[in-house]
């Protein structure tokens, strides 16, 4: 992970992976360790014959969606990944990154909140590196504050809407601060979501 930290410290406007490049100069949240870990770690459900539907909530630069596209292609899985974000600049950034990737036909970005997003088919997998600060001092940059604070997407809303959007056998993969574990497990139970893997 030293390579990621050094690129961010130098203020690089992009991060280059093996098969794609992520530009992050227009969005509030830059490429970081959390997103890279979630993109590499989240378990891909086994979906036979049909096309796997994936939703990336709060996509930012589109990093996680791109990592999942690469993994799904390697698995020879048919897929469609939808990426949503409430910040128009992040959506524009992710669209650019998607269009320049080898999976442009499988990726789409939309300016939408999770609360307002609907899809008739439901999703096999929902991923998110959600806002994580609660009741703490906010960054003066409004876009960065939105990306980092739970005001626009609380954990309760995140899990309730994930339940609404998931297929009956779908999976939700999140990366969260350890302090949120008790609350998340409680909300998972309320929403009838069963934890299968917790990694520290």
Residue spans for each PLM region:
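Mobile active-site "lid"/loop adjacent to the S-adenosyl-L-methionine
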Residues: 130-157, 161
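General small-molecule cofactor/ligand-binding pocket signal
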Residues: 23, 82, 108-110, 196-199
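Class I SAM-dependent transferase core
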Residues: 4-46
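Accessory (non-catalytic) regions of SAM-dependent nucleic-acid methyltransferases
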Residues: 2-9, 195-200
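A generic structural signal for alpha->beta connector loops
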Residues: 19, 51, 78, 104-106, ...
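Conserved Class I SAM-dependent methyltransferase catalytic core
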Residues: 27, 31, 153-200
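Conserved SAM/SAH cofactor-binding pocket of Class I
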Residues: 40-119, 125-128, 134-139
């Amino acid at each position: 992970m030293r390579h990621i930290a050094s690129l961010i410290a130098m203020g690089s406007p992009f991060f280059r992976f093996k098969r794609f490049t992520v530009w992050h100069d227009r969005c509030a949240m830059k490429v970081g360790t959390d997103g890279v870990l979630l993109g590499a770690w989240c378990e891909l459900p086994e979906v036979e014959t049909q096309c796997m539907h994936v939703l990336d909530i709060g996509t930012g630069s589109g990093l996680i969606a791109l990592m999942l596209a690469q993994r799904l292609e390697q698995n020879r899985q048919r897929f469609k990944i939808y990426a949503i974000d409430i910040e128009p600049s992040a959506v524009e950034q992710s669209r650019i990154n998607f269009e320049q990737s080898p999976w442009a036909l499988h990726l789409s970005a939309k300016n939408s909140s999770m609360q307002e997003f609907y899809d008739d088919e439901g999703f096999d997998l929902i991923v998110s590196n959600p806002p994580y600060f609660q009741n703490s001092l906010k960054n003066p940059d409004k876009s960065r504050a939105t990306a980092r604070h739970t005001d626009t997407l609380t954990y309760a809303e995140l899990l309730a809407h994930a339940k609404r959007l998931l297929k009956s056998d779908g999976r939700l993969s999140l990366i969260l601060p350890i302090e949120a574990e008790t609350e998340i497990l409680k909300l998972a139970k309320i929403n009838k979501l069963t934890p299968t893997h917790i990694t520290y």
